[in-house]
């Protein structure tokens, strides 16, 4: 439906239809592998497949440029508080919908910025971090509060609700959306060799450096020359 609206030049309608089922098309429009395009039935009629990924991105950029996207805080709050643990894609989606329903939402994350693997696992050439920041600013303007550098001991053997409330305070409900920040190791020959590293570790480190986060080190050497 949103592709049809786009075809007819109705950009704002396309935006409304698209975001009715996807809160963050500006993310999926950049990083989705677009597997659906390979199965598009238009190819059976000598046409090119629909460019869903590029269309999503174009619709959202037009929406930002034309100010279709503006802060829309809920008119009425329910009086209920929800804590979302994890500011990755799942946590952000949960926070977005809960806030729209009128809940008071607090998002907690161990990192210094929101986004999870969107920020720390995907290179800038695929997803510029300004795109993430733009969305986070909108969510803040709608009343969602973000708390960074907060580690919740969910993996502890002695984990309890008392520990959870001690770490982030008492809420009416909790959404655990910590995601998968750890890479899946491979049990293959040569994995134990020196110099063989997991790609996710490398991507995370590189993205953190680009964000201005220096890795822990006792000594820092700076070389300058002409």
What are these regions (language model features)?
Residues 12, 16-20, 35, 78, ...:
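General secondary-structure edge motif
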Residues 3-7, 24, 28, 32, ...:
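Catalytic cores of large soluble enzymes that bind and process phosphate-bearing ligands
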Residues 1-30, 46-76, 206:
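Ferredoxin-type iron-sulfur electron-transfer modules in oxidoreductases and energy-metabolism complexes
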